[in-house]
């Protein structure tokens, strides 16, 4: 490992993404795991982070407080839950640490607070980090601009049964891309559920449907019709 490796702190260390991040950081000479954090009372507290990730020891114990390990030269990797993410972002902003956030399910108020905190330190916040979804978002935006308003837009997403939030952050981002391309206010045009006698669909409505089944990693479809 290089002496100049970037020190990272993994929040949600025992979760699906946390374990993956720990494993990837261990194999990447450009990174050094400087800390690992889990919720107070979690069974992983006190264990070696490498063991939690299912690999060789990293020499870093999982703790329950980001404030105990967060330093300005570090980058905090957070794929947890909205309330925890905001708490971690406050600490990182106060200490001057970088932030990479992939948490989804934040409401409007939480997103506004996160945006204010992000202005105080270097931050990447994205509901989906994949190149494919980034390209898809650009293509959806282009299609929404080229197709006139008579083409109604619907977003459908499918994820594994263990995903906690719905609809997915990626589905919401795709809906926002459609709204932005058409000059619409997404918060007023989105429709997250339909049931019963709902009447005729408004032309500017953007429907978003979340499906949960099996172990699907994540499928997203945008329909213009």
Language-model features: where?
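Short glycine-/small-residue-rich Rossmann-like dinucleotide-binding loops
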Residues: 80-81, 104, 210-212
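An anion/phosphate-binding loop that grips the pyrophosphate of nucleotide cofactors and donors
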Residues: 73
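Adenosine-phosphate binding glycine-rich loop
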Residues: 111, 120-173
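C-terminal substrate-binding/catalytic lobe of Rossmann-fold NAD(P)-dependent oxidoreductases
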Residues: 4-70, 149-225
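Rossmann-fold NAD(P)-binding glycine/threonine-rich loop
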Residues: 83-95, 102-125, 134-143
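Alpha-helical structural signal in soluble globular domains
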Residues: 20, 24, 91, 95, ...
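N-terminal Rossmann-like NAD(P) cofactor-binding module of classical short-chain dehydrogenase/reductase
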Residues: 76-77
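Residue-level detector of alpha-helix initiation sites
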Residues: 15-16, 83, 130
């Amino acid at each position: 490992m290089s002496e100049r490796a970037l020190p990272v702190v993994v929040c949600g260390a025992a979760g699906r993404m946390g374990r993956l991040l720990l494993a990837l950081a261990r194999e990447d000479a450009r990174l050094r795991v400087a800390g690992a954090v889990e919720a107070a009372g979690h069974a992983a507290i006190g264990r070696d982070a490498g063991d939690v990730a299912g690999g060789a020891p990293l020499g870093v114990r999982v703790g329950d407080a980001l404030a105990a390990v967060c330093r300005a030269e570090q980058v905090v990797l957070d794929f947890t839950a909205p309330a925890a993410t905001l708490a971690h972002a406050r600490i990182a902003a106060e200490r001057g640490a970088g932030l990479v956030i992939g948490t989804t399910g934040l409401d409007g108020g939480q997103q506004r607070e996160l945006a204010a905190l992000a202005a105080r330190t270097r931050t990447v916040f994205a509901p989906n980090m994949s190149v494919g979804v980034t390209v898809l978002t650009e293509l959806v935006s282009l299609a929404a601009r080229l197709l006139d308003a008579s083409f109604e837009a619907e977003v459908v997403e499918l994820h594994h049964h263990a995903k906690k939030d719905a609809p997915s952050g990626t589905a919401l981002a795709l809906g926002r891309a459609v709204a932005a391309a058409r000059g619409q206010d997404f918060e007023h045009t989105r429709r997250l559920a339909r049931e019963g006698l709902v009447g005729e669909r408004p032309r500017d409505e953007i429907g978003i449907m979340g499906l949960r089944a099996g172990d699907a990693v994540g499928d997203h479809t945008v329909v213009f019709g």
